[in-house]
Amino acid sequence: MTSRWKPSPTLQASAALHLGALAGIAVGLPMSWAAGAVIANHGLLTAAGLWPRSTLLGSNMLRLSQAACEANQIAITIDDGPNPEVTPGVLDILDAWNAKASFFCIGRHIEAHPYVAQEIIRRGHSIENHSYGHRHHFSLMGMRSLRQEIVKTQEIISQTTGYMPAYFRSPAGLRNPLLDPILQSLDLKLVSWTRRGFDTMTNDPNKILQRLQTDLAAGDILLLHDGNCARTVTDEPVVIGVLTQLLASLKLKGLKSVSLNCAA
């Protein structure tokens, strides 16, 4: 059941400011004052959209629930696939460590490699929505285009795998104020991350591991990539080496990786 959209306090304040600016102009306040306030407000909203972990534009899942923390669970999320050259290896490593993950997949990549998406589900992981095209201008899109990107991917994932995603992650984590009402209308939860390895830009597994493991704790949501991941000096996808060491470290710490849909 879809819930009625409730704007965040920031968006409510923004709407009030716009109304106040119009009222001020109507009673003769200087236009420059009203324009300055509106411009400053739009600057704040833009900055909020450029900050992936921001909650100013609406709900944004940064960590797992308290129950998941108490169960010593963490979530490994893997973005930008499926990639037939990388994803199968990632799945094998997860199997070897009896770990589960959530794969935020791009719709057009699922269309190109449906059998890889089906294998992700067959092995007990979840596939979540990462938009259809992973457009660089995603955060600049209007409501109709945003909705098309998301709905099309929901349909592709469902028709290909039989699984209906419950979570969405924006391309690069960027968004605008129009995204939150769309997600609520589709019963999707926005997810970002607690910490990321920057494995699309760094080819040194040790540096990536250090970023992921510093202050690592139960309830964390980690971000890695099977699509567009960097390659080591030996031309191996960096996520392969990172994931093996990360899962070994989690075991030593008594932490278990679960998919988002199975977290406590």
Where are these regions (language model features)?
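N-terminal membrane-anchoring alpha-helices
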Residues: 1-63
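Active-site beta->alpha N-cap acidic-glycine motif
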Residues: 49-138, 152, 156, 256
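A cross-domain feature marking catalytic cores of carbohydrate-active enzymes
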Residues: 78-80, 105-107, 129-131, 169-172, ...
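Acidic-and-aromatic substrate-binding clefts and catalytic sites of carbohydrate-active enzymes
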Residues: 81-85, 105-113, 136-144, 169-177, ...
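A short acidic, helix-capping loop that chelates divalent metal ions and anchors anionic groups
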Residues: 134-141, 229-233
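Charged helix-capping and loop-helix junction motifs
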Residues: 145-150, 205-210, 236-243
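His/Asp/Glu-enriched short active-site or ligand-binding loop at hydrolase and phosphoryl-transfer sites
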Residues: 174, 180-215, 255-264
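Catalytic grooves of carbohydrate-active enzymes
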Residues: 213-264
